[in-house]
């Protein structure tokens, strides 16, 4: 039975490590006068191809339901960004808007430094033409949409080139204007203090003699560059790719490989489209009451696009109409994302053990609210988990202590039966039955802790709250590996001590394998997040104390009975 236990431990170690690696592979300005509104909407069709227009920009513009007034254009025309960007800064966002099309082409997060040693350099989420391509685009396409013009995307004007949320100001509105053929357009961005979501609204003021019709589109465009927010240590890559909401699947991942295979089209009511990376998410959220056409595609420049097209907005002559969507660009904060749209909080992906990980994060968050330090919070969480499993662990350690106590009898059986494994195995089972020992009892703590261990791994890896979270001394970031490998070495030492408390396998080969386990696990844990290794160190330390106490108690009782 000892060989089964050895095989189980080795198998769990290998499965854990390989499972982590496999997961990683699947993932690496002034307002217009208010007028009477006379507008209606109809559902959009899902386009079969991307449509653009001649001129500067329109390979980026998706086609809506084709009409005689919709200008088809070459697909190969790349977007050309304006050098004269409009800069907007709030307390949590620092972004730039391109007047050509009104796209958000740059975005930084001032509260999230790119590196811990450079707190003055904010993490850059969007970039266009720098190190990579990642931006949020939106516009009006369809019959009369200005983004479907043969002349290219509209060039907006603004009253200022720089906007900043002032002290004491809670809301800031940035209006971009464009007029053509008697129709006045306002592309309005509304920012609020402390929020990473902004509302983008199109106001269509139709002063022409003809009805106006168009569709709002919003999309995220990204190249295939690596994730700048992800750690690079072995075993810590996370999912980089798109995702969307459907009624049947509230969180549907769409990887770059999926987009390479062909367009994905869905018709959904409400929903959202998003691009995920480590710790951060960007999402377009349309009107939750509207039926929207969601689509993914790959443009001729090799960029990946996921977006939606809203129902047709119709505006009568002399009337005004509005259509809007919300853009979120910021950290994966579950509470915030859940309020924005159903299912969006699932972008904090805890894997197949999410039902264990979610309560762990909830408890960890509440402990942190009291202690104010994630490292100490992990220690307290470990103590609570250990207390929860105390009865089960105690039963297991009692079984192991009894096996340790009968070790001399097992050695005697080995001498009696020699190399006759069948008789040896039969004699061992009779001895275990006589002594009321469960030979597999020592495996229970490992089996029970593995789901908790894996769940905590994803909590530490996926939760933005852990990003750059310090503990003490040299541990300045619990979400990445220990820079000096001190915690993994301590963990290996605790495993060695635990091993000394366990019964020695009667087979010499098994004994050698067991002696190698602390070294093997130490190697595995070298690149694991420091917070996870901290959990394992504390758990092992508590286990040693519990097991040593039970072992001494049973050995004393055994000696007393023998006297």
Swiss-Prot record:
- What is its subcellular localisation? Cell inner membrane
Indicate the transmembrane segments per the record. Answer: 1-21, 344-364, 370-390, 440-460, 471-491, 518-538
**Gene3D superfamilies with a match to the protein in the record:** 2.70.98.90
Which InterPro entries would you find in this protein's record?
Membr_insert_YidC, Membr_insert_YidC_N, YidC/ALB3/OXA1/COX18, YidC/Oxa/ALB_C, YidC_ALB_C, YidC_periplasmic_sf
Q: How does it assemble?
A: Interacts with the Sec translocase complex via SecD. Specifically interacts with transmembrane segments of nascent integral membrane proteins during membrane integration.
The record's annotation in PANTHER family points to:
CYTOCHROME C OXIDASE ASSEMBLY PROTEIN COX18, MITOCHONDRIAL, OXA1
Question: What protein name is recorded for this chain?
Answer: Membrane protein insertase YidC
Q: Which organism's genome codes for this protein?
A: Pseudomonas savastanoi pv. phaseolicola (strain 1448A / Race 6)
Top-down, what is the taxonomic lineage of the species of origin?
Bacteria, Pseudomonadati, Pseudomonadota, Gammaproteobacteria, Pseudomonadales
Q: Which gene encodes it?
A: yidC
């Amino acid at each position: 039975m000892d060989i089964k236990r050895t095989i189980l431990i080795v198998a769990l170690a290998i499965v854990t490590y390989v499972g982590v690696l496999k997961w990683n592979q699947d993932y690496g300005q002034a307002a217009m006068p208010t007028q009477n509104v006379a507008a209606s909407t109809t559902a959009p069709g899902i386009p079969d191809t991307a449509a653009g227009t001649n001129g500067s920009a329109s390979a980026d513009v998706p086609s809506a339901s084709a009409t005689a007034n919709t200008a088809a254009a070459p697909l190969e025309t790349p977007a050309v960004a304006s050098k004269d960007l409009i800069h907007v800064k709030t307390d949590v966002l620092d972004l730039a808007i391109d007047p050509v099309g009104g796209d958000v082409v740059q975005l930084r997060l001032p509260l999230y430094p790119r590196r811990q040693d450079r707190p003055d350099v904010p993490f850059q989420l969007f970039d266009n033409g720098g190190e990579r391509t990642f931006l949020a685009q939106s516009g009006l396409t369809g019959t009369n949409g200005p983004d479907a013009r043969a002349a290219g995307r509209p060039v907006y004007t603004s009253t200022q080139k720089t906007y900043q949320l002032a002290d004491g100001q809670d809301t800031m509105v940035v209006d971009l204007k464009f007029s053509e053929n008697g129709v006045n357009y306002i592309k309005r961005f509304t920012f609020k203090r402390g929020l990473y979501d902004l509302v983008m609204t199109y106001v269509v003021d139709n002063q022409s003699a003809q009805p106006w019709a168009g569709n709002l589109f919003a999309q995220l465009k990204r190249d295939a560059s690596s994730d700048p927010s992800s750690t690079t240590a072995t075993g810590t890559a996370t999912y980089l790719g798109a995702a969307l909401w459907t009624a049947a699947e509230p969180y549907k991942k769409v990887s770059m490989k999926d987009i390479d295979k062909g367009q994905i089209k869905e018709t959904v009511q409400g929903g959202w489209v998003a691009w995920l990376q480590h710790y951060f998410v960007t999402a377009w959220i349309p009107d939750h009451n509207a039926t929207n056409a969601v689509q993914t595609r790959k443009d001729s420049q090799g960029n990946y696009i996921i977006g939606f097209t809203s129902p047709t907005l119709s505006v009568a002559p002399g009337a005004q109409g509005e259509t809007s969507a919300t853009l979120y660009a910021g950290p994966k904060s579950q509470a915030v994302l859940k309020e924005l749209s159903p299912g969006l909080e699932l972008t904090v992906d805890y894997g197949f053990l999410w039902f264990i990980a979610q309560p762990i994060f909830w408890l960890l968050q509440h402990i942190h609210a009291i202690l104010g330090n994630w490292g100490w919070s992990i220690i307290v969480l470990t103590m609570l988990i250990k207390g929860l499993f105390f009865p089960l662990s105690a039963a297991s350690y009692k079984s192991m202590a009894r096996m340790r106590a009968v070790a001399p009898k097992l050695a005697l059986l080995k001498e009696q039966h020699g190399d006759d494994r069948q008789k040896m195995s039969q004699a061992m089972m009779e001895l275990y039955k006589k002594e009321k020992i469960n030979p597999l009892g020592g495996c229970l703590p490992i089996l029970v802790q593995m789901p908790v261990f894996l769940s905590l791994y994803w909590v530490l890896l996926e939760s933005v709250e852990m990003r750059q979270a310090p503990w003490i001394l040299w541990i300045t970031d619990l979400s990445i590996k220990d820079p000096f490998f001190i915690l993994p070495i301590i963990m290996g030492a605790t495993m060695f001590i635990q091993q000394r408390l366990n019964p020695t396998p009667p087979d010499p080969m098994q004994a050698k394998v067991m002696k190698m386990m602390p070294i093997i696990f130490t190697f595995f844990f070298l690149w694991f997040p420091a917070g996870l290794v901290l959990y394992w160190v504390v758990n092992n330390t508590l286990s040693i104390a519990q097991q040593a106490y039970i072992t001494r108690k049973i050995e004393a009782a055994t000696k007393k009975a023998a006297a």
